[in-house]
A protein has these predicted regions:
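C-terminal active-site "lid" helix and adjoining low-complexity regulatory extension at the edge
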Residues: 206, 224-261
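Phosphate-binding site of ATP-dependent enzymes
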Residues: 71, 95-187, 229
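A long amphipathic alpha-helix within ATP-dependent nucleotide-binding catalytic cores
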Residues: 123-128, 171-229
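A conserved helix-loop-beta module that forms one wall/lid of the active-site cleft
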Residues: 11-93, 99, 106-119, 127
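Short, flexible loop/turn elements at secondary-structure junctions
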Residues: 60, 81, 132-134, 149-151, ...
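Short catalytic/ligand-binding loop motif for oxyanion handling, primarily in non-cytosolic enzymes
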Residues: 41, 64-67, 83-88, 97, ...
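Short, solvent-exposed loop/turn elements at beta->coil junctions and helix N-caps
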Residues: 60-65, 133-136, 223
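Short, small-residue-biased leader/transition segments that mark boundaries at the very start
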Residues: 1-6
């Protein structure tokens, strides 16, 4: 809330305050590589292996440089510096290129550093990548498992569904035992029935540990696709460090887990 500004910013207490503090005080060159959607693949593969990486089909600086004839029938376009501009193409012959261009070009203009002072993004060169279209045989779309890791220790995760429509989206925080966590987010409805635990959950936890070691806080996002674990992305400041927790005291409880000294 607004009381955040009144507190001494050099003595952060809550989770959100500590993420704000880290934004200003914890700046390492490799962070740029870790949040760049193209470069992160190489970084992550060097730690957990190439088999967990969704293949890249191409990288471009401008939408008009994309040679669609070179791409397969199905693919995904995204911007390397932004989590908003996502174009999922299931059938190239039906792709609305004009709409895709508009979405990607809007995303290319977003700068997380200017918007939320998220330093890792400051030096990310905005590019467009095409990735292989991944589909789970269940046909239920991909579920993202987002692990909240504190110095290499995953304590909670959240799963979400249908995030493209805020009214019907569901989001729940879970413990490492796949039980409902004692907190949530005030801006999303929770699942009434928890989604099933992924079959490769233990492997996911191991991967989250390997990728988050040495960082006071890191969110590690993973997919399970056809019983295989794939890397999604790494995030230093979820919600830019303005996560609306309910009950509110969990902002401070999670803050205790972030060791910044």
């Amino acid at each position: 809330g607004s009381e955040m500004c009144i507190r001494d910013s050099n003595n952060p207490v809550t989770f959100n305050e500590k993420l704000q503090w880290l934004k200003l005080n914890d700046r390492k060159p490799e962070y740029t590589e870790m949040v760049d959607k193209f470069m992160a693949k190489k970084y992550v593969a060097s730690i957990i292996g190439q088999e967990h990486i969704i293949p890249t089909l191409g990288v471009w600086s401008h939408f008009d440089d994309i040679d669609f004839d070179e791409l397969p029938t199905q693919f995904v376009l995204k911007c390397t510096h932004d989590s908003g501009g996502l174009v999922v193409c299931k059938d190239k012959s039906n792709l609305n290129k004009k709409a895709a261009k508009k979405k990607i070009e809007k995303s290319m203009k977003t700068n997380y550093y200017k918007g939320g002072r998220e330093w890792p993004y400051k030096n990310v060169k905005p590019q467009i990548i095409a990735e292989e279209y991944m589909e789970d045989i269940s046909g239920n779309g991909l579920t993202d498992y987002k692990f909240y890791c504190f110095n290499g220790d995953p304590k909670y995760l959240y799963v979400s569904n249908g995030m493209d429509n805020h009214e019907t989206a569901r989001l729940s925080f879970l413990t490492m035992n796949w039980e409902k966590a004692p907190f949530g987010r005030s801006d999303y409805l929770e699942f009434e029935v928890l989604p099933p635990k992924p079959t490769k959950f233990d492997e996911m936890v191991k991967i989250a540990k390997s990728l988050s070691g040495g960082h006071p806080f890191l969110r590690v996002d993973l997919y399970e696709i056809n019983n295989k674990v794939y890397f999604s992305e790494l995030t230093f400041s979820p919600c830019g460090g303005f996560m609306p927790f309910v009950p509110e005291e969990w902002d401070a409880k999670l803050g205790e887990m972030v060791n910044i000294r």
